[in-house]
Amino acid sequence: MKRSMYAGRVREEHIGQEITLKGWVGRRRDLGGLIFIDLRDREGIMQLVINPEKVSAEVMATAESLRSEFVIEVTGQVAAREQANDKLPTGAVELNVTALIVLNTAKTTPFEIKDGIEANDDTRLRYRYLDLRRPEMLENLKLRAKVTHSIRNYLDELEFIDVETPFLSKSTPEGARDYLVPSRVNKGHFYALPQSPQITKQLLMNAGFDRYYQIVKCFRDEDLRGDRQPEFTQVDLETSFLTEQEIQDITEGLIARVMKETKGIEVTLPFPRMKYDDAMALYGSDKPDTRFDMLLQDLTEVVKGVDFKVFSEAPAVKAIVVKGAADNYSRKDIDKMTEVAKQYGAKGLAWVKVVDGELNGPVAKFLTGIQEELTTALALEDKDLVLFVADTLEVANATLGALRGRIAKELGLIDNDKFNFLWVVDWPMFEWSEEEGRYMSAHHPFTLPQEETAHELEGDLAKVRAIAYDIVLNGYELGGGSLRINQKDLQERMFKALGFSTEEANDQFGFLLEAMDYGFPPHGGLAIGLDRFVMLLAGEENIREVIAFPKNNKATDPMTQAPSTVALKQLEELSLQVEEDETNKTN
């Protein structure tokens, strides 16, 4: 029979109606001769009642055979429950079953289909189709669908054009490692899966599309963590003839629309703006979490005269004050934080506690001469804990920024109901890579430098500033964008500053440089990480929770066993040969 409605949508208004439902058996209970079944579908749970006095022996026998995750079809009359269940939207009603058909049986599942399960991540991914039956996973993916629907409607209203760009593109040396695809037709040549549609969307501006968008898969072969996947989705925008502010206004409107339509939250516009240098100085991060205080304090000048060379001779000394937390952290706890500090390049972590108005701790004796000045500078009160890092400015900022976030989580200082958006602007154009031994693009090599610093492309690259902007939410980079270079000579200067020879630039980006000979308009854009945005809206801590079929931290899929080996014939067709792993050679 045709399904009348979803099980999770039956309400009191349907009492007295005969309906047909289809779904999965959640659980079965036998009470006083009656059989109660929780029928589950994507919209929720409906209680079924099978009364032996009102159904045939065949229906009763079928009901007794039901097990969890059997797929069934039931017909019956909606009735009011004697005792309502306020925890369920369907809790005021039940279905008195008159007909029951088993559409399919099921083996015992490797974990219960319910929220809050304790199965490990790989088991969940191995049986992802079962994991996705759980209500919280269904809700996460329904939220994702609502977000993309809201985004499309908003951009369509602003006359953006949805254009698909190629997945088989050219490998470029900047950024993360590419996923490479060998060409069978052009032996020895490789495509790359795009890390973003950056160049193709710029070329669409040269083609006169004016406003482009795409919700698009991108690929990066990089080490994974909770908010990264090898394949991810971004909301990609590009516009012609707009200023930095106009692009940000459009982005803020998009986010405001999504927040209102999916969370019922009215966000305050415009978003705050923070310079990159201020973000690093005050928060120790280029993606500051502004939901709590504990700002970094610069004490370099304050401690210059102390008889403690670690402080007095350090390039920078910075600190954070953990208010009222002296009793929360033992020496053992601080030792653990010291190990964290070392992971960020710090040589150690100094600390004092304020106890009865005096400084206590390993370095307190060196600070007695400046206690009053230190107390004033840091606004110290009894029971405060102060953590110091003496190192380069970059190391001090990064270390204390990491500790700031860790401590805030441990002490419950973060209001998880807050959504604090802000723009980080005035970025450096380049960042030094110790691994590469040279300056690299902080964003990408197509970013427009600020006019007043562009002359440093042939001088001190550390002084070049970009017309770039990142949108940050609760300590996560939600997205980033910039105005782009549209003048050929400036683009060539940029490539040269990055160490490209003329030949290398033409080999890698000759098509883009050629396009700049044909009236390339001023343009700029932005990309928002959809997975990360939905993760934050859903209150999750890992983007796997908002992606239907993600990879694990080893970039593998436990369900399909991807990536896998392939037949020798397939490799031969591609003129490829796989070298045996050294560990296998010795076994």
Curated annotation (Swiss-Prot):
One Pfam entry name: tRNA-synt_2
Instruction: Indicate which residues the UniProt annotation says bind ATP.
Output: R220, D221, E222, Q229, E477, G529, L530, D531, R532
Per its UniProt entry, which superkingdom is the organism in? Bacteria
Q: Where is this region: Aspartate?
A: 198-201
GO biological process annotations for this chain's record?
Answer: aspartyl-tRNA aminoacylation
Q: Which InterPro entries does the protein's record reference? A: Aa-tRNA-synt_II, aa-tRNA-synth_II, aa-tRNA-synth_II/BPL/LPL, Asp-tRNA-ligase_1, Asp-tRNA-ligase_1_N, Asp/Asn-tRNA-synth_IIb, AspRS_core, GAD-like_sf
Coarse class of the primary localization is cytoplasm
Q: Which keywords accompany this UniProt record?
A: Aminoacyl-tRNA synthetase, ATP-binding, Cytoplasm, Ligase, Nucleotide-binding, Protein biosynthesis
Tell me a GO cellular component.
cytoplasm
Catalytic activity as recorded in UniProt: tRNA(Asp) + L-aspartate + ATP = L-aspartyl-tRNA(Asp) + AMP + diphosphate
* Positions bound to L-aspartate: E174, R220, H443, R484
Q: What is its EC number?
A: 6.1.1.12
Where located?
Cytoplasm
- Record function comment: Catalyzes the attachment of L-aspartate to tRNA(Asp) in a two-step reaction: L-aspartate is first activated by ATP to form Asp-AMP and then transferred to the acceptor end of tRNA(Asp).
Q: How does it assemble?
A: Homodimer.
The record's section on PANTHER family has: ASPARTATE--TRNA LIGASE, MITOCHONDRIAL, ASPARTYL/LYSYL-TRNA SYNTHETASE
Provide the family line.
Belongs to the class-II aminoacyl-tRNA synthetase family. Type 1 subfamily.
> What name goes with this protein?
Aspartate--tRNA ligase
Q: Which organism is it from?
A: Streptococcus pneumoniae (strain CGSP14)
